Design a protein with these regions (language model features):
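Bacterial carbohydrate/catabolite-sensing allosteric modules
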Residues: 1, 10, 42, 83-88, ...
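N-terminal helix-turn-helix DNA-binding module of bacterial transcription factors
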Residues: 1-60, 330
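Short beta-strand segments enriched in small/hydrophobic residues
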Residues: 17-20, 54-70, 169, 177-184
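Amphipathic helical "hinge" segments at domain boundaries
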Residues: 45-110, 114-117, 195-198, 202, ...
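Short hydrophobic/charged patches on amphipathic alpha-helices used for structural packing
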Residues: 51, 105-108, 132, 167, ...
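Short beta->alpha connector loops
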Residues: 98-101, 122-127, 245-246
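Catalytic-core regions built around general acid/base machinery
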Residues: 129-137
Length: 333
């Protein structure tokens, strides 16, 4: 894709001078204007008018596509992104992808046809290669999940390290049989967290029973039912590592309703009621506000200067918040 820097090189001027020509700066000489116009024609370059309007302070719109706005993690992230962009005079078009991969392409392409100035997206499918032609003309940043089949800019959290810390924490409190509950491996966050779980199980010499790994469906309620079945079986798990917030909420409710108050649990992702429950829920905090803020920064860099080098991969640290549920000792046999 031809950029402003390419035009500057062919015209023999700086990128700043090219920008001044685009913005009709009266202090640029006619000779310089002609050289820039000649270079544009030679390279078949069309100025990014959306970026121009953004710099001029005009209203522009950014698309934000997430799996589920009801998920507390994505809800907090969405609020952060909206506040940040609207404070800069930019509207935000929010859409939900759901958890079915077939819906993702339809929703994103419908959004991109609206000629938005940029897109922030947390994908749900296993292949984003269909976005390649769109990315040529619309800046994109991938959030929470790295794109697959496409080279793109993405901002994620340390899923691997967070899962390792969660399981290690349970191991330090005496647990040997730790169950993993998550969603489909189609989601890259689940894949990385499962790898972190397995790494910690091996490192701490825990029981590597395959029956302790459960990914029944996208439904947290089904995960809760499967957990209760495992707790009723011989040699049940004494602790649970939950892969995401909806799953954690369903598992905690099921444990309470079934009277399994001695089962330890650590969830990946914080949520509003986590500290108010009894016992309060130990979590791996993902910092959704920080993720959203950096995603906005990366997107604005790409909008302002499409040819600029932007850091492609950003991984934010996570932190364990001990509150009680992850510190319960194993129940006596």
């Amino acid at each position: 894709m031809t950029t402003m820097r390419d035009v500057a090189r062919v015209a023999g001027v700086s990128a700043k001078t090219v920008s001044r020509v685009f913005n009709e700066d009266p202090h640029v000489t006619e000779e310089t204007r002609d050289r820039v116009r000649w270079a544009m024609q030679k390279l078949n370059y069309v100025p990014n008018l959306l970026a121009k309007s953004f710099r001029a302070g005009a209203d522009t719109a950014v698309g934000l596509a997430i799996p589920d706005i009801a998920d507390p993690f994505f809800a907090e992230m969405t609020s952060s992104i909206e506040t940040d962009l609207m404070g800069r005079g930019m509207a935000v078009v929010v859409t939900s992808l759901g958890h079915g991969p077939d819906r993702e392409r339809y929703v994103l392409e419908a959004l991109l046809r609206r000629q938005i100035s940029g897109l922030i997206v947390a994908c749900v499918s296993t292949d984003q290669s269909y976005l390649a032609p769109w990315q040529e003309r619309t800046p994109m940043v991938f959030l929470d999940r790295a794109p697959r089949g496409l080279a793109g800019v993405f901002v994620i959290e340390d899923d691997l390290g967070g899962a390792r810390e969660a399981v290690a924490h349970l191991a330090r409190h005496g647990h040997r049989r730790v169950a993993f509950f998550g969603v489909s491996l189609r989601v890259t966050t689940t894949d990385r967290r499962l790898k972190g779980y397995r790494s910690a199980v091996a490192e701490h010499g825990l029981d590597a029973d395959p029956e302790l790994i459960c990914m029944p469906s996208e439904s947290p309620e089904v995960a809760a039912d499967e957990m209760l079945k495992r707790l009723a079986a011989p040699n049940p798990p004494t602790a649970v590592f939950s892969c995401n917030v909806p799953c954690t909420m369903a598992l905690v409710l099921a444990l309470h309703q079934a009277g399994h108050n001695g089962v330890a649990i650590v969830g990946f992702g914080d949520f509003p009621m986590a500290a108010a429950l009894s016992p309060a829920v130990t979590v791996i905090d993902q910092d959704p506000i920080g993720l959203g803020r950096i995603a906005v920064e990366r997107l604005l860099q790409r909008i302002e200067d499409p040819g600029a080098q932007v850091r492609r991969r950003t991984v934010l640290p996570v932190s364990l918040i001990p509150r009680g549920s992850g510190e319960l000792p194993p129940a006596a046999p």
